[in-house]
Amino acid sequence: MAYSYEQLEQWDKQYVWHPFTQMKQYAKERPLIIERGQGSYLYDVDGNRYLDGYASLWVNVHGHNDPELNAALREQLEKIAHSTLLGSANVPSILLAKRLLEYWPHMSKVFYSDTGAAAVEIALKIAYQYWKNIDPVQYAKKNKFVSLKEAYHGDTVGAVSVGGMETFHRIFAPLLFERIEVPSPYVYRMDEYGSEQEIVGYCLRELERVLEEQHDQIAAVVIEPLVQGAAGIIVHPRGFLKGVERLCRRYGVLFICDEVAVGFGRAGTMFACEQEEVKPDLVCLGKGITGGYLPLAATLVTEEIYAAFLGDVDEDKTFYHGHTYTGNQLTCSVALKNIELIEKRGLIDSVKRKARRLAEWLERLYEIPIVGDIRQKGLMCGIEIVKDRRTKEVFPRAAMVEHRIILEARRRGLVIRPLGPVLTFIPVLSMSEDEMAEAVRILFDSLACLYEQARAELL
């Protein structure tokens, strides 16, 4: 049965509460209602097409409606859709775990979940219980976690506890466990600390100071390797990630790497940790794991950590955590095919090549005076919008400049999203160079249009 746009708009606004959305503002606007996708494009119910410039929230790898991923899903659906992993196993989850660990040979076990936030939540709980399982007396105080300024690791209570984004997390402060914040190398806004490497040195010294003083109370350090995504695509200079790992080893705290956003080719390698030869104790995977098809996440751990949970039943060393759809056959089957296609299609080399071209095209955006900084790692791009380049002052939130830019881009055929004052361009990984060039052209024209409006209204 076909429904008119007007009917769908009415029901959407009447019945659906959208995530991370101020619904009062949403109700005033004409919503984008997607009906289908093909390749790098999304199509709305009226047949208009849009380049998917945010990879449907950073998840899409091979494009929409990929025939091989579709076939893998159908093949599994003909066998079974779901059976529990609590006390029993299934074929796709076994094969996927084996496949993932081929990329992480120092790891030994895979614990499945369904969202990146859940993968982080699991990592935090494992890290906490690990110390208690080893020696609850000696490690009784190892209850704290360290994370970066402006950290974002998801929106469950544990993940929010290690988050540092004031806008998102402030209201929930009374619900959260204790977190220690350390500075992040946000180069664009840390001029006073000197060069990139001087900024890295400062941040690592601050982390070492915390670890030196409180290592006996800290269970783990958790970071997004190389790029803080939701913070506005803050790209860490080379050496920071490796430096954090060294400090964790020196002071005897666990190291958790949240690869949810940066993994599966997004940052230019299959996994971000490869770029600095880092071997964390726990790794969180999600987003691109199924190529953008279905919700799946995983937490990988070393044998040393896993072994701490082994014991007799009455020792209570069991990890009492699990989700209803943990290790679901449909999700694991499509994830297996996704990894196979990443390799077969040479996707990682393609991402590296396209990232170099994209960096060249993005430079033109600096011609627009409200573009303060452009940050990129692989196919993750952040364009920071400022009112004044000299002072780096941003526009007032109430002016909604960034929101107006994305609406203008949508009108021209590109879907993107802002993160505070930062426009993010996170394309489908398989997007062609011609399509990316078109996306950047739309970005330029949209920015130019809003600059003229802002100059008249706000500058």
Question: What is the meaning of each model-derived region?
Answer:
Residues 1-459:
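Conserved N-terminal phosphate-binding loop of PLP-dependent enzymes in the Aspartate aminotransferase
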